[in-house]
A protein has these predicted regions:
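Short amphipathic, positively biased membrane-proximal segments
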Residues: 1-164
Length: 164
């Protein structure tokens, strides 16, 4: 349990972000174009659809990988008890719902949606149940997780834009 449960976060990340590495730069324009009109205007003028380069995605995924790797190591170090590990595990699990909601909203494939219900959610549910059965208290905090992971996500996109 000490290694396997925190390591499952890395497996989940590798699957989901591997899918994003393979598909995001090629599908982003189509995804944004399929958004309902009221949601398109904040991301562009409606005439040009923003895209992200493959390099941007590579840098962003690598940067997020540092955060997820650090969280998994902290999870191993604390047998899943650390707030940092639990926050990242929780938010990574929850983010799968965002992929699925985006696919429903755009009525099509969005990068990351294939591994969200097949890997990310089952791994997250399994990890939570294993921690609960082991008597590990849930110390995660959604606001704290959003602050930490969200800030890191902004950093990952900024670095991706700089190095693209």
């Amino acid at each position: 349990m000490r290694v396997l449960v925190p390591a499952s976060l890395l497996v989940s990340f590798a699957a989901n972000d591997g899918e994003e590495l393979a598909t995001m730069s090629g599908t982003m324009a189509g995804t944004l174009a399929r958004l309902p009109a009221p949601l398109r205007s904040p991301v562009g003028s409606g005439t040009e659809v923003p895209t992200v380069s493959r390099r941007h995605v590579q840098v962003g995924v690598a940067t997020m990988g540092v955060l997820v790797g650090a969280a998994a190591l902290d999870g191993v170090r604390t047998a899943g008890r650390s707030r940092f590990y639990q926050d990242v595990q929780r938010l990574f699990g929850l983010h799968a719902y965002g992929h699925m909601a985006a696919a429903l909203l755009t009525r099509g494939y969005v990068s990351g949606v294939a591994t969200s219900p097949t890997v990310v959610l089952p791994v997250w549910w399994w990890a939570r149940s294993r921690l609960r059965r082991a008597g590990v208290p849930d110390r995660s905090s959604l606001p704290r997780a959003v602050l930490v992971v969200g800030s890191w996500l902004v950093l990952s996109h900024a670095l991706g834009a700089i190095w693209a």
